[in-house]
Amino acid sequence: MSISSSQEKDELARIQESTDYAVTRAENGFIMGHFFNCSLSSVFQPVFDAKTRSVAGHAAYIRSVVSEENPLSPWKVLSLGEGDAPLVRFDRLCRAVHVLNYFSGRSHEGNLSVTVQPRLLESVKDDHGRAFKSILDIIGVETSRVVIEIPAEVNRNWKLLKHVISNYRSHGYRIAINHNDAGDDWVAELASLYPLYPDVVRLEASVLQRLGDAGPLVDVIHRFGAQVLFREIETARQLTGAVRAGADLLQGRFLGIPAQAIEFDLFIPAATTEYRSAEASSRRIRTLQHYIDAARI
């Protein structure tokens, strides 16, 4: 992926001038954030479109080190401060680092998925996403190219979840939530989000084995207008099962590991997706009725 050096410098300089985020460029050209005595950078895992078998975007993850000999977990960094203020600052810095590394000076149409800490969603009472939008505005990226992944912990408070979705969507972000494998209650609660349904619902690939046939659940999620992403795909069997179930998006180490390289010239072999249409068509007839009933508003 070609990078315009002058454009990258301009965008980094604008962030440095407009915010107090400690961001610098490493020797390899990647942007680094600095939090206490830790250096933070990004890795990106490809997310595939199950229909085209090509890369649709990437999920961003933070990596941090104190020194080359002493790796430090990003979550350990949070213990360096007390209260929510350091967490808010850390979380926002991570997302700034991600978007600079993913979008700055790069010409591609991929979407970027970023996570948000549960405590941040609780501590920031209103207007979630406004501070992040200001960073995107500085580097000229539309919020519609960013998917906000809301952690599964927030599913325990559906009132908060609905409030958070409303705030982020008002700024134009796409929203992804996590399925927590709670059966019919989860489907009914998903229905209760009306009209604030998520854009993407993330399912663990392990659900394929637990349910036997995840197709009916995928069908119900589609009825809410959401795409289904199967994540943590570790085997060829899980990949095949996800495609047969009707997945829209696919992610996991079997398809690509998180790395600094942002690659788009990757493809899933056609053999894994060839039965998608026939399987989905036949399943429409046998979708579980109790799922359908739970989905009705």
Task: Give the location of each predicted region.
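Short acidic, S/G/P-rich loop/turn micro-motifs used as interaction or catalytic elements
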Residues: R119-S123, E153-N157, D181-D184, S206-R210, ...
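Well-formed, non-transmembrane alpha-helical positions, independent of function
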Residues: T52, N167, A191-S192, G241
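EAL-family c-di-GMP phosphodiesterase catalytic domain
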Residues: M1-H34, S39, E153, Y194-I297
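ATP/nucleotide-binding catalytic cores
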Residues: K133-D137, H171-D184, P195-L196, V228
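PAS/PAS-like sensory domains
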Residues: N37-V43, E109
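Short beta-strand/loop segments at the ligand-binding rim of alpha/beta enzyme cores
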Residues: V164-H179, L217-F230
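Catalytic core of bacterial cyclic-dinucleotide metallophosphodiesterases
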Residues: S2-I15, T52-F90, H108-L120, E142-A152, ...
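Catalytic core of bacterial c-di-GMP phosphodiesterases, primarily the EAL and HD-GYP domains
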Residues: F90-L160
